[in-house]
Amino acid sequence: MNNRLEETPQIDNTDIILEVHKISKRFGGIKALNNIDFSVRRGEVHALVGENGAGKSTFIKILTGAHAPSEGKIMFDGKEYSGLTPALALDAGITAIYQEFNLIPFLSVSENIYFGRELMKQGFLDYEQMNENTKKMFKEIGMAINPKIRVQRLGIAQQQLVEIVKAISKNAKLIIMDEPSAPLTEQETETLHTIVRQLKGKGITIIYISHRMEEIFEI
């Protein structure tokens, strides 16, 4: 697995939010990851570049708790983990946006963002507040999507924005983006990169996974 670090001079080098020490992962006799050391600072965009089969997906799944490492440890935001569960990762502030979005097509944008964490008022779902909060979160990244529209009516780029806002709503400290530009047009990719820079400005750490070297230098 190869990686490239984008330097962020205004952030103290000692402000490391994620450290991975000697992480290995075996599947039977196959070693998918071998003694990986990796660190990233708070509010930094860190690109991981590698071809298919390089271990990028396995690495994501370890960070998000879908796989337990065979060896090694993870330090995140000052806490040490020998392995993460999905619930622990989410509580810690780690979230991932995969190429296949985790959205429910027949629900609205705001319902997807608050799914499983719905706001209540006097025993009923508080749609008004969820819609208002959703509008504000989109505005924070310079975008506008009707929070009442069903996700199935949105294009791929808009669905990706819903995933990003969903991560923001969960107070994500680290967002892992897996080949986020793969389904996008050139203009949509430029918009995505602008949003990534905005998230960085808010102190959110981004791990940006891609196999396109030319794209990495644009972020």
Positions of PLM-derived features:
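Glycine-rich phosphate-binding loops of nucleotide-dependent enzymes
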Residues: N2-I219
